[in-house]
């Protein structure tokens, strides 16, 4: 894969103010509407390539893993190991982890139709989470799948939701989006039938998808567990790589 908009490449040496300014520019350039994005049916039927993106961490390095699937079957894997130069700062994750992700995606010999990124998309203070940044850099439809809610407010409680339930996440006053804008969904991908102990995922469009389609695409990715199959496999690949490089 090649970068489509290299001017948005995250630079960890920037000041915090400059990072936030770049994120405003990214949000303005990104699209949160369906634009040449794969349909959920294409994902289910194997007519679209879906890349799961996740990371693991050593003391001073990030291990970025990408697993590409077609119809649930793995067709490609890539990774990159890159030094970490700044600490974790809420809302500025792309400046810490974006470089390793770019390196891993750039090594792919296939062109994914969708990126499924472990992290937020539009559910972000400046509407420019990791999935938005990555999707715009490569100009590929992207969706963010987060385990925790960074910002915004659920329109109703997300406690003990039945499997398959979707609850809109609305922008609040910590975000640049207008209050009440639906920026994503809490999605109960899996649930125990007798003990509702699994928390929902927080799904948001990264680039070239609307919020509703983002959830539809994640649901179409399938998987037996809470995480969609692409990011679950990327998570496992990242953990295996961490063990390999950690021993070195």
From Swiss-Prot:
Mg(2+) binds at residues 54, 118. It comes from the Archaea. It is an enzyme of class 3 (hydrolase). The record marks 88 as: Interaction with target DNA. It is found in: Cytoplasm. Signal peptide: none annotated. The keyword Magnesium applies. It catalyses: Endonucleolytic cleavage at apurinic or apyrimidinic sites to products with a 5'-phosphate. GO terms for biological process: DNA repair. Its cofactor is Mg(2+). GO terms for molecular function: deoxyribonuclease V activity; magnesium ion binding; RNA endonuclease activity, producing 5'-phosphomonoesters; single-stranded RNA binding. Gene3D superfamilies: archaeoglobus fulgidus dsm 4304 superfamily. Keywords: Cytoplasm, DNA damage, DNA repair, Endonuclease, Hydrolase, Magnesium, Metal-binding, Nuclease. It holds the Pfam family Endonuclease_5. GO terms for cellular component: cytoplasm. Its EC number is 3.1.21.7. DNA repair enzyme involved in the repair of deaminated bases. Selectively cleaves double-stranded DNA at the second phosphodiester bond 3' to a deoxyinosine leaving behind the intact lesion on the nicked DNA. HAMAP family: Endonuclease_5. This is Endonuclease V. The gene is nfi.
């Amino acid at each position: 894969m090649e970068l489509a908009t290299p001017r948005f490449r995250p630079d960890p040496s920037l000041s915090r103010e400059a990072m936030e300014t770049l994120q405003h520019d990214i949000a303005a350039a990104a699209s949160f509407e369906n634009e040449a994005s794969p349909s959920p049916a294409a994902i289910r039927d194997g007519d679209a390539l879906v890349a799961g993106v996740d990371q693991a961490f050593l003391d001073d390095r990030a291990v970025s893993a990408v697993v590409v699937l077609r119809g649930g079957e793995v067709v490609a894997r890539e990774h990159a190991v890159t030094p970490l130069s700044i600490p974790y700062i809420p809302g500025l994750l792309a400046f810490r982890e974006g470089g390793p992700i770019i390196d891993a995606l750039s090594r792919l010999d296939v062109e994914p139709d969708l990126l499924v990124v472990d992290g937020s998309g539009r559910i972000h203070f400046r509407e420019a989470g990791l999935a938005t940044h990555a999707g715009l850099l490569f100009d590929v439809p992207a969706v963010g799948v987060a385990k925790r809610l960074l910002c915004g407010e659920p329109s109703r409680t997300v406690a003990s939701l039945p499997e398959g339930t979707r609850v809109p996440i609305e922008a609040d006053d910590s975000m640049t989006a207008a209050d009440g804008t639906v920026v994503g969904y809490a999605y109960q991908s899996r649930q125990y039938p007798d003990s509702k102990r699994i928390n929902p995922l927080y799904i948001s469009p990264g680039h070239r998808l609307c919020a509703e389609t983002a959830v539809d695409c994640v649901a179409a990715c399938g998987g037996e567990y809470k995480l969609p199959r692409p990011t679950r496999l990327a998570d496992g690949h990242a953990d295996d790589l961490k063990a390999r490089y950690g021993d070195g």
